[in-house]
């Protein structure tokens, strides 16, 4: 199984509001980047969408080392998600987990892979995280500008 590195970030203006997501995949010197967005979303939805889109770009099962500045995504991937599934997406507060549809899609696209997430501090000089942040903010701004027309 190949080991790939996935960097991801999401951005949301006004939260909720226009948002953007971005990822960078790296494998043996090869790099793939993509980004997108939505007119009305949240920061957590964009953070999670970035990971989903990055996983969808993989052509075969991989060991995925995910680096994200979202503690929400990192904690869910590494520990919360199993409990949510067992409890039919009811959280520890006895309320439905937010973004259920996106988490279900994450489960579907991550199934062939072995994903481990690491949290990295945002805006701390990590080159790939900074690039993802820039790409995601550009998409969020684009969607906000289109909504203003």
Curated annotation (Swiss-Prot):
Binding of Mg(2+) 1, residues: 9, 47, 69
Domain RNase H type-1: 1-141
Annotated Gene Ontology cellular component terms: cytoplasm
UniProt cofactor note: Binds 1 Mg(2+) ion per subunit. May bind a second metal ion at a regulatory site, or after substrate binding.
Keyword flag Cytoplasm: yes
Keywords associated with the record: Cytoplasm, Endonuclease, Hydrolase, Magnesium, Metal-binding, Nuclease
GO biological process entries: DNA replication, removal of RNA primer
EC number per UniProt: 3.1.26.4
Cofactor: Mg(2+)
Localization terms from the record: Cytoplasm
One Gene Ontology MF term: nucleic acid binding
Pfam families, per the entry: RNase_H
UniProt cross-references to CDD domains, sorted A to Z: RNase_HI_prokaryote_like (cd09278)
Enzyme class: hydrolase
Reactions mediated catalytically: Endonucleolytic cleavage to 5'-phosphomonoester
Binding site for Mg(2+) 2: 9, 133
Family the UniProt entry places it in: Belongs to the RNase H family.
Subunit structure: Monomer.
NCBIfam families reported in the protein's UniProt record: PRK00203.1
PANTHER family documented for this protein: RIBONUCLEASE H1
Function as written in the Swiss-Prot or TrEMBL entry: Endonuclease that specifically degrades the RNA of RNA-DNA hybrids.
Xref: HAMAP family: RNase_H (MF_00042)
Protein name: Ribonuclease H
